[in-house]
């Protein structure tokens, strides 16, 4: 006899789910199906792609943080949360009759086979760099992107702005549209900063000019081999550290918040 315990939806009905020492992929599919069933969880069964979109992003970022921390236990947990999100979205589509989780897996396996002809075919690539070039060429052919502009249009607009800027710049550079070295990128950044200053003084076009400054800064980072998001993340951590030093100093010296700027400069 199966050992079953129950999930309760509203205290009115019980949904049986087999308890066992270890679960697998099929169990995840089944528990998501049960949670979204008419007898399942009141919250889960009313969710849509849009309502849990943020959850997917947050779980991906939490997995990324686990990688940064090199915490295997945390990474295992967070990858599970990401996988749960993927299965949840696929189950919504299964109910709509548009695709299933099997279709998702089938599609990604076929994509990997197609984009690795040097492994599963007769093509030859002898370096990671040549593999990336081949991957991009195959991706563009697969998606029917005949021009660099079409490839740029396909870069996800939901990406963090700095990463999107970096990807767009790389595609332009691959097409031959770029500064020859970092000096040109630095000069452009200085030019954009001057234009931002003028915009602030006139009160017109500040948002556009600020965007230009950030875009130019990303290009400098690209020439220097620096990930712009990681650079900003590091600055955020530095800001927290310095702010706490200022805050602690102000408290110890009985100073007011108005005096924190002077302490801040001392902390730098």
Predicted segments — roles?
Residues 2-78, 84-210, 214-268:
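Flexible "arm" and connector segments at domain edges
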